[in-house]
Every structure is written in C-alpha cells, then in structure tokens.
Amino acid sequence: MAETKKMIILKSSDGESFEIEEAVAVKSQTIKHMIEDDCADNGIPLPNVTGAILAKVIEYCKKHVEAAAEAGGDKDFYGSAENDELKNWDSEFVKVDQPTLFDLILAANYLNIGGLLDLTCKAVADQMRGKTPEQMRAHFNIKNDYTPEEEAEVRNENKWAFE
C-alpha cells in the first residue's frame, strides 16, 4: 500500500493557495513550528509573502528536499556530483530581477529558511563585490545623502575599507 504524504496548504498575501507536502513545508522553521502547534488544519496564512514569491520559495524547498532524498542521507553528498548539480541549480535559481531577489530575501527571513536566506544574501553580496560605493549606489538605486564633508569623514574613519 502506497504511503500517503501529509499535505499542507499555504495561503499567500494575495489569496493564492498552495498545497504542498509537509516534508517540503517544514524546510521553513516558521511553518514547522505552526504545524507542531496544530495551527495548520485550515491552511497557514502567510501575510508577508505574495503568491509569486511563495511559488519560488516552494520551488526552492521542493528541490532541496528532493536532492536530500536522492542522496538518501549520504554523508558524502556535499562533496558529490549531485551536490554540484544542486549548486548549479541554486546559482540559476537566484538569477532573477533585483526586486524578486529582495522579496526572496524577505520571505526567506520571515519563513526562517536558512539555506534560502544564505543563498539570496550571497547573491546580493556577489553583485556588490568589486564595486565602488558610487557603483553600488547606482546598481541598487541608493541616494547619497551624505554631504561631501560627511563622506570624506566616513572615508577617513574607515580607510582600511578603501585600500
């Protein structure tokens, strides 16, 4: 007899519902705690996550659950070809526009999905690598609200960062 998998319903801020396996849902510590506290019977509302972003989060969690299952608890998984495939998948996953990437960071933080938070924050850090403060401001559309004097003072106090 086939084992039936427990399903969980997640409800996005814009009213979309997603029915997913509990094993995928518990990649989120936030959702895991709600399930443990018996708060999942009528679906779990996620008021801080839109349907589009939740779909991406679910895609990430599902891929990582499947990869772990395929590895079968193999301790050498993290040095294996399968892990290289997952790393490649992850690097493609974060090749999204900037607003989506930032929304994924917020969702990963809200849902407490450490791997996704690390991945998305690393993607932003990689975008910053090698850029001057001016280039970063332009890239992230950040207004410089320092006076020239204040900026010179900050640069002087933090010379090590500009070497």
Swiss-Prot record:
Its main location: nucleus. It comes from the Eukaryota. Disulfide bonds: none annotated. GO terms for cellular component: cytoplasm; nucleolus; nucleus; SCF ubiquitin ligase complex. Involved in ubiquitination and subsequent proteasomal degradation of target proteins. Together with CUL1, RBX1 and a F-box protein, it forms a SCF E3 ubiquitin ligase complex. The functional specificity of this complex depends on the type of F-box protein. In the SCF complex, it serves as an adapter that links the F-box protein to CUL1. Part of a SCF (SKP1-cullin-F-box) protein ligase complex. Interacts with At1g56610, At1g67340, At3g62230, At3g59000, At4g27050, At1g55000, SKIP16 and SKIP32. This is SKP1-like protein 4.
